[in-house]
Amino acid sequence: MFFRRNKNSSKPATATVNNQKPVTYITPNGQYYKPFLTMVANNHLLVAGATGSGKSVAINGIITSLVMVDSPYNVQFIFIDPKRVELQQYEKLPHCVYYADNKADIIKGLTMAVIEMERRFAIMKAQQEKTFTGSKLYIVIDELSDIMTSYKKECFPLLLKLAQLGRAAKCFLVCASQTVLAKIITSEFRCNFPVILGLRTATAQQSRMLIDCNGCEQLPDPKATGKGQGIIRDGADTFNVDIYKYPDSEITRVINYWTSKACIA
């Protein structure tokens, strides 16, 4: 989960998600931070940085945070996992609509997302609504560079359509990439992401490509400091954030809780 320093408050910061009871977040060292779950939960999100910059920690934090505060009735996921490493553990969640880890299944999963988006637009048209009022669907992709290098012809048109139209239908892309190159994160694709989390990059040029300014190249190596740091670009604003790493035991506990539920809340 992402946190921003809240220096003017002596109380834990809270965030209301999906109109539910506010959730209080306190870091292990007792400092108070303002959570970014509300912002992340309602936008496309791009997470990118060099290898070892904390991308997997951030993605796991986002998924775990969303699952901790909402039921499968309100939040669903399509997991696109060409790396076959980080997202596999979430396949058994009742929130998981589809899990894909090979070319055929990845194309099928993205096609499913587009079909669901179109279905929601049909409902919105029939009800004369500008935004979808039902559940949120997150299409989590780890690793974007694998798709853009191996399956671009089949997958990029689907990704671009979701990026351009998905937000109104509550179909949100969460894309992670450890390759910060223009041929992977194209300007046509990136401009549809109002929220970008820039992690440590190799060069200032890569930082500018991600968040439109320098800074990511100066972030410390999380392996050396023991904690993840990043820079979030939210529209025209940028700010530094610390990234809390959920222990593997906590992620497992959350997954086991939901898989043990006899019925969906």
Q: What do these predicted regions represent?
A:
Residues 130, 134:
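Conserved phosphate/pyrophosphate-binding and hydrolysis machinery centered on Walker-type P-loop NTPases
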Residues 2-125, 135-205, 211-227, 231-232, ...:
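P-loop NTPase catalytic phosphate-binding loop
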